[in-house]
Amino acid sequence: MAQEDDLRALGKVMDFMRGISVIFLLINCYWFCYEAFHTWGFTLGIVDKILMNFQRTTGLFSSILWTKLFCVVFLTLSCLGTKGVKEEKITWSKIWTVLFAGFVFFFLNWWLLALPIGKVGAASLYIFTLSLGYICLLMGGVWISRLLKNNLMDDVFNTENESFMQETRLMENEYSVNLPTRFYYKKKWNNGWINIVNPFRASMVLGTPGSGKSYAIVNNYIKQQIEKGFAMYIYDYKFPDLSEIAYNHLLHHLDAYKVKPQFYVINFDDPRKSHRCNPINPAFMTDISDAYESAYTIMLNLNRSWIQKQGDFFVESPIILLAAIIWFLKIYENGKYCTFPHAIEFLNRPYAQIFPILTSYDELANYLSPFMDAWEGGAQDQLQGQIASAKIPLSRMISPALYWVMTGDDFSLDINNPNEPKVLVVGNNPDRQNIYSAALGLYNSRIVKLINKKKQLKSSVIIDELPTIYFRGLDNLIATARSNKVAVCLGFQDFSQLTRDYGDKESKVIQNTVGNVFSGQVVGETAKTLSERFGKVLQQRQSMTINRNDKSTSISTQMDSLIPASKISNLTQGMFVGAVSDNFDERISQKIFHAEIVVDSAKVSAEMKAYQPIPVIVDFTNKDDSDNLKETIEANYRKVKEEILSLVDLEIMRIKNDPKLAHLIKM
């Protein structure tokens, strides 16, 4: 009740002040337009005497401005004490417009009284403009009291609440990868750094096509790790994009290595620009389990659906058969024919020749006992089905170019050997990825085993477009390679793609064991998963209630997503969110980032223009300068076939001539 009385009293005071303001307005008109009022018959003697006394004692009418100023002062005071109903449509631009118009009409109209249109006409025009100006000033004042000063729609996307301070220090060490950034915080853009001080805890780079994964991050990984003397293995899905960067950067930074590294290329498309390497080199296979790993990798790369069916009979059977063939070639004459093309050719011999030869060796007899039981039990259909499961997919890999590359031994796959460091790039082709991925997957699995050892050179494994190739043992490499100084960087589009091609279990392991995460624009479940990974932060919430008489504002706080999924789904090109890992002696308090990775485009373009193409490695020309590429690789292709035919004939003859083994030959 008391509050209502106070409000009522305040209203009366404001009305009184507005009344005084109107009186000053009328006095101004009466005094300075007196002749017009006299003509109209609106003068009063008592008013004249009062105004004359004011003039003698105060000089109030010595200038036309004084009464106007008093009028505006009291008008302002009356408006300040007025509480109007808040209105969202009233804006400062509208208020300033009417105030400016009011000022012009109210204060800048004195010259109208001197117009040569007669006293009455000039006075009428003056009074009209003065009144119009007063009304405009009154409107502006009332609108100020009705202005909604707390506009909750200024930050419709909650940008301020979701911006946060990020790392601004540059933290370098002998292994680190450092990326300059720009991030938004407290209404301005700031310069910062993403410091991957421990790349051995693995990194993954996600983003839809065109989000800038390779340009902003993967390329920087390659360059900076070469500058710091890493041995390197690069899977280049769109050969030679990454390969040329690695080759040219290595040329300019050979001094970063204690022992000069060699640059090697595996490229099935162009044998001229490819070294030759045998991924199942017998020197690096110590046990039949190594043969099994190789067979497993090949078959799962050729049959991606098998990844989800590991352990099934018709999945394991062809893998075991191929593993037995690889191990046989390893032990036969000290691995003279132990290459993948020889294994394919041997598998394509009739099973009546394959099984007697393989089971004639004691170490393979037990390994192949299920096949022999089926053969001896007359289950020919089952046996043929098992063999066909291996033959059909492997037949897709019969290619002279592939045979050429995989039967040579230009280098070994121990890329981080301190005495022979290497930078190896393997190139795929999107048009032939189903064929090449199986062979390249074999290189991957062998490299993983060879580099994950103690007392080797620091090394890096960079896989662009990971789902295009099945990388056997990748989850184990990520989990165990840190102590062996192996840095893994994986590039792919989103988690659903990884789950589709690697299976749910292996995909989850990869997602949850990687320590450094970069993500450009991703959508759906991937965005939600990342948002949950980045966690929540205390955010301010403001609400407003407006009624006829008053406005009330409430401010509260609540935990909400630091980087919501909707933000991750709408990141612009070059903008990344993520988190990094730190070390015991290099603590990073703010590991999460949401920033634009700064790339000097002009510098990068200049570097790329100066790049040298990867040189010709093998010269396929005759003395008369004619090209003999086709003849050479075809001759190698025929040689592999002939060597297997000869091997089979010799082995069959050996078995027939040995009384203890002769029973293996079924007539």
Q: How would you name each of these model-derived features?
A:
Residues 76-79, 441, 445, 516, ...:
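Hydrophobic alpha-helical segments involved in membrane association or supramolecular assembly
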Residues 593-597:
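N-terminal charged/capping segments associated with class I S-adenosyl-L-methionine
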Residues 54-59, 339-343, 407, 545-549:
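Short, surface-exposed recognition loops or helix-turn segments adjacent to catalytic cores
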Residues 478-480, 484-581:
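Conserved ATP-driven motor cores of ASCE-family P-loop NTPases powering translocation/secretion/packaging/pilus
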Residues 148-157, 194-486, 502, 568-572, ...:
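P-loop NTPase motor domains
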Residues 1-211, 215, 220, 547-548, ...:
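Basic- and hydrophobic-enriched, low-structure N-terminal and domain-boundary segments
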